[in-house]
Structures are given as C-alpha cells and as structure tokens.
Amino acid sequence: MDFETIDPTDFGTSLTGIGINLLVRDVQAETRFLTQVFQMQGHRISADFAIMQNLSQLLQLHSDGTYFSHSLLDLLPENPPRGAGCEIRLYHCDPDQAADKAEHAGGMVLQPPTDKPHGLRECYILCPDGYAWVPSLAIKS
C-alpha cells in the first residue's frame, strides 16, 4: 500500500484491529519527534494529518483543529500531558538510543533505560504533547 497516494476512503476502510489516533497541537513537530527519537516513518505529512509507521504498525496524528466540531476536543487539557494513564509501547525499539535522542528532540525521559523483570529493557519518554512512549527491547542474556 502506498501511503503517500492512497485515497482517504481506501485507507480508512483498509484499517483493521486496534487503531491509535493521537490529537496533537502540531502534527509536523510530532512527526519530527517520532522520526528522530523512534525512527518511525511519516507519510502524507501535512499541518493537519500524518500517517506514522512503526515496523508494520500504523498510527495517525491529527491536529486539534481537525476535531473542531468533535466533542473529544473539549476534553483535552490546555497543557500537556494529554495522554495521562496511557502508555504507547514500541517493541523492538532500542530504549537506550531513544533516550539519548529524546531531550534533543524536545521530549523528556521520565524513566531512563532499565532492565525489567518481564524480560524487557525499556524507558519512558514524554513527547512535547505529553504522551508516554515506551521503547523496549528484549534483554540480551
């Protein structure tokens, strides 16, 4: 599927499983953050929308303005964090590399890379919009 040229209706009807759609203040800034810190690929990037790809998984970014008539917009806090209580986990994403890049890209490392009892090395990073991203890799024995 060519994400740069696909018709919006064809894209929407092709989605399956669970989808993640994040409302952000600045789509292009969030795209840069996700690309720089987590090596995601951005597609159809505009001021209002982007398709982000992490391995085979997709998520969508929408600007606040695209939800101008949606009741969800009224629930967003004026200041981050926006995603309190939600972790967006990125498996097979190096937490040490992500943590090294996060602050330079405008994020904040909440928890540095740590080996966890469940077999993953992970860290917690807040993006400028306040969503918690958790890159992780299996601990090498």
Where are these regions (language model features)?
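Conserved active-site tyrosine of GNAT-family acetyltransferases
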Residues: E30-T35, A102, G130
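Short, basic/low-complexity N-terminal boundary segments at the transition from targeting/disordered tails
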Residues: I18-F33
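Vicinal oxygen chelate
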Residues: M1-G19, M40-L90, A99-L126, L137-S141
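Loop/helix-junction capping segments adjacent to catalytic residues or to phosphate/diphosphate-binding pockets
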Residues: Q28, D96, L120
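Short, conserved clusters of charged catalytic residues that mark active-site
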Residues: A29, R44, D94
